[in-house]
């Protein structure tokens, strides 16, 4: 089968690789000059299935109000003048209940754990290298309230049989020796030993090369203007003056997926702006050995070979990609507070990207009401974590195979009204 994939981020490239491995003739189209040059370029570097959780959580609405008055707040909201933003935020608020949180986190952990398994198999099969580490993730708590609040997440981990360790301040140095100097600032930590790390952009670039070796064609620097429709199906992709035709089409355009298929269905994927800095390591003993997540600031600090990646925060501000100095200050403050002297933040590069987020946090992977149109988008802050599993899952669906995990509740149909022939999602 001929398959066209729109988008060459980590999710699009993973989809291409697994489809090609299944025997399909695959073409990837992207407006950029190469793979992983937008959202996948400089993310936090975590592959953290156990920490897969929606931003829509109990208590978040009240926290959001409090964060409005904090200098280093992890969340910021500025109205972008669109009705869609208001609809999306309303839908997100409706998911901030304990019941919805448990359902959504369960879906996310299921896909993320499967994706980690797919990544490990890929690594074993191909030997792909991407400055990866398998030292686990350590979530750090600065208050007793945060430590107590981890109970709801631990319950989900236990249900999913995800191994974990609850560490006291004195025990944190077992996972991250450099934290011994700052353990007095912390009340404890939750460690997931099965989590991994790696440079997402490097991985995507090397996976694209592997996909090419399987026959995948990459068309970079190519405009993606519209989908051509005929007889209720997709008939091609309009790329400038050319129409590219296939049997099946995959939209993996991240935050741009919503507007691209708005004439067919209203997919609730909104850009969640995040930031990162990447600093050179200057003192090995003071640097992290794997990755930590600061629960207070929602910031991840990840070790690459000779670099530290610090990323996080969320701004609901539309497609604004302006680099804000205050956000860099927050990232530098966090890493220098936990790992003082480990990296030289004065020499760090500064980046921002738009994560494609759904109101419930769960990505949209699978079929649509249009028979030959598939989606692989909406992974939010977990595109790297979920990429391989999402790619394999989509390849199975397109190939007519039974997926290895439950997939029905990951499709766009969960957002569609229960009306025959209806292709527009319900926001209320």
Swiss-Prot record:
Name used for this protein in its record: D-amino acid dehydrogenase
Native species: Burkholderia cenocepacia (strain ATCC BAA-245 / DSM 16553 / LMG 16656 / NCTC 13227 / J2315 / CF5610)
Keywords from the named record: FAD, Flavoprotein, Oxidoreductase
Lineage: Bacteria, Pseudomonadati, Pseudomonadota, Betaproteobacteria, Burkholderiales
Top-rank taxon: Bacteria
Residues bound to FAD: 3-17
Gene name per UniProt: dadA
Biological process (GO), any one: D-alanine catabolic process
Task performed by this protein: Oxidative deamination of D-amino acids.
EC numbers on record: 1.4.99.-
Listed cofactors: FAD
InterPro entries per the UniProt record, alphabetical: DadA, FAD-dep_OxRdtase, FAD/NAD-bd_sf
GO cellular component terms, semicolon-separated: cytoplasm; plasma membrane
SUPFAM superfamilies: FAD-linked reductases, C-terminal domain, FAD/NAD(P)-binding domain
Family membership: Belongs to the DadA oxidoreductase family.
Catalyzed reactions: a D-alpha-amino acid + A + H2O = a 2-oxocarboxylate + AH2 + NH4(+)
Keyword Lipid metabolism: no
Pathway involvement of the protein, from the record: Amino-acid degradation; D-alanine degradation; NH(3) and pyruvate from D-alanine: step 1/1
Listed GO MF terms: D-amino-acid dehydrogenase activity
